[in-house]
């Protein structure tokens, strides 16, 4: 992302809180890959942005370190509240 372009993307399909863990967003990766510990930018539908860190990735009850294009996953986002992200927003890195 050094030149300002994003190589990885996922549109948020659902958002929910898991007690004791945090906020999870679900979707299918449309481009690239995401890894635990990676920094991401949330592009809101209203044009605003938020920054977050991937705290975990889960696919069908299996914890992953990395997920790739085409994978349907849940991403645990650190330091994000339910007001900071919604369905239709895009996660990029």
Segments and roles (model prediction):
Residues 2-93:
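C-terminal effector/interaction modules appended to NTPase cores
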């Amino acid at each position: 992302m050094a030149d300002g372009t994003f190589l990885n993307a996922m549109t948020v399909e659902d958002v929910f809180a898991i007690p004791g863990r945090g906020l999870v967003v679900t979707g299918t990766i449309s481009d690239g890959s995401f890894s635990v510990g990676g920094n991401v930018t949330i592009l809101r539908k209203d044009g605003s942005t938020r920054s977050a860190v991937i705290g975990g990735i889960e696919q069908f009850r299996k914890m992953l370190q990395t997920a790739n294009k085409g994978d349907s996953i849940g991403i645990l986002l650190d330091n994000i509240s339910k007001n900071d992200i919604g369905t239709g927003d895009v996660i990029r890195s």
